[in-house]
């Protein structure tokens, strides 16, 4: 059984017991969260597809950790103008573990 959920502007294919990193969610560690924007649920032969979401469907997940991703380095330059700019960015994320799909 798996589901496709939308969180943080992205879509993820999830199944029970799977751990994944999503955009930062303001929740405490070890707390349960519900992802209600479920786009699709597949259970063996039956497949339910929402328009755009499935009514009453939810995916329960547990917050495992909060963190920051790898540093992305940005370098801008204009040739012949002696202009150089360096910048870095680290995106915050939340690691969750899927507990149940209902």
Swiss-Prot record:
Lineage summary: Bacteria, Pseudomonadati, Pseudomonadota, Betaproteobacteria, Neisseriales
Superkingdom, natural source: Bacteria
Subunit-level organization: Part of the 50S ribosomal subunit. Contacts protein L20.
Protein family according to the UniProt entry: Belongs to the bacterial ribosomal protein bL21 family.
Any one of the GO CC terms: ribosome
Coiled coil: none
One GO process term, biological-process aspect: translation
The keyword Ribonucleoprotein appears for this protein: yes
Main function: This protein binds to 23S rRNA in the presence of protein L20.
Keywords: Ribonucleoprotein, Ribosomal protein, RNA-binding, rRNA-binding
Protein name (database record): Large ribosomal subunit protein bL21
One MF term in the entry's GO annotations: rRNA binding
SUPFAM superfamilies: L21p-like (SSF141091)
């Amino acid at each position: 059984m798996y589901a496709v959920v939308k969180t943080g502007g992205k879509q993820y294919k999830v199944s029970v017991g799977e751990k994944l990193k999503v955009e930062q969610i303001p929740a405490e560690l070890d707390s349960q969260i519900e992802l209600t924007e479920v786009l699709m649920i597949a259970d063996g032969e039956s497949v339910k597809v929402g328009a755009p979401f499935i009514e009453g469907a939810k995916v329960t997940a547990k917050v495992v950790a909060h963190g920051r991703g790898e540093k992305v380095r940005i370098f801008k330059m204009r040739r012949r103008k002696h202009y150089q700019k360096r910048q870095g960015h680290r995106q915050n994320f939340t690691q969750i573990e899927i507990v149940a799909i209902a």
